[in-house]
């Protein structure tokens, strides 16, 4: 509890300082994010682009998924980057916050990594596969297994809510072992395969590109930039969106964010550049 309180106090102090500076300088943008990969995405990809346009960019990191939206709604932040549309919509509706999505961002997929087995072709009857135990990410893992043909899910199951109860056929008698997401990288020492979320894979020193299979992320799970709805037409919002759509950010994505799933606008830009 003391650790959580200390983190919240530090975040509040950072926000107070950022807000004071922001009040003096309208060209300063304060962007909130979760610590780790999405903070790095801002620091390496977006901040340099905006600074070349004369903006000062301050990045505030949070250790929870609640404060960033409250801080945005209250005006301490100009934008935040940490959530997908399902979470934003529910949180904003439940708490009556006037927040909107601006643009999607490159997102880390969940991947199937090899433990005792180093290729998908080596899968054996009775293989042990560890997977996240939270409903959202477990559904993602089960849908991947179904698409790979290793299991069959019940007809018409909602892919966003699939659970072990929805496994209709398991011809290889795979042993599906749900674990806390943070434990999944360590489980590779004992399991044949493990589903690992991108942020935990990177934290464990794994490369996203080492995954044997990677999900095609549903639009529902692609992370985004959130802003206050009232700010949609402001010039800085247009500049922020343009930074994400830029060639410079695409180059940064290719250089620093290997393994992230690119956005539709980045894929379209790549296609244009190849012509």
Per-region residue spans from a language model:
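A bilobed periplasmic-binding-protein/Venus flytrap-type ligand-binding module shared by bacterial periplasmic
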Residues: 109-120, 222-236
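Alpha-to-beta junction loops
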Residues: 73-83, 127, 150, 172-174, ...
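Periplasmic-binding protein-like
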Residues: 139-146, 244-264
């Amino acid at each position: 509890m003391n650790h959580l309180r200390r983190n919240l106090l530090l975040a509040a102090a950072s926000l107070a300082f950022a807000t004071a500076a922001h009040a003096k300088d309208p060209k300063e943008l304060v962007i909130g994010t979760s610590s780790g990969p999405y903070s790095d995405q801002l620091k390496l990809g977006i901040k340099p682009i905006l600074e070349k346009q004369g903006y000062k960019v301050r990045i505030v990191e949070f250790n929870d998924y609640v404060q960033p939206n409250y801080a945005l709604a209250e005006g301490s932040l100009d934008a935040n980057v940490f959530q997908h549309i399902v979470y934003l919509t529910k949180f904003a509706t439940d708490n009556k916050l006037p927040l909107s999505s601006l643009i999607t961002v490159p997102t880390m997929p969940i991947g199937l990594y090899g433990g005792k087995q180093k290729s998908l072709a080596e899968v054996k009857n009775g293989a042990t596969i560890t997977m996240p135990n939270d409903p959202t990410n477990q559904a993602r893992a089960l849908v991947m297994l179904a698409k790979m043909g290793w299991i069959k899910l019940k007809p018409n199951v909602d892919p966003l809510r699939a659970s072990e109860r929805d496994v209709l056929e398991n011809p290889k008698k795979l042993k599906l072992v749900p674990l806390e997401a943070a434990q999944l990288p360590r489980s590779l020492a004992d399991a044949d395969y493990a589903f690992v979320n991108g942020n935990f894979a990177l934290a464990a020193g794994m490369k996203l590109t080492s995954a044997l299979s990677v999900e095609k992320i549903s639009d529902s799970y692609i992370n985004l930039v959130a802003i206050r709805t009232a700010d949609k037409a402001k010039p800085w919002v247009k500049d922020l969106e343009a930074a994400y759509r830029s060639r410079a950010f695409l180059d940064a994505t290719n250089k620093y964010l290997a393994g992230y799933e690119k956005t539709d606008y980045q894929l379209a830009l790549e296609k244009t550049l190849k012509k």
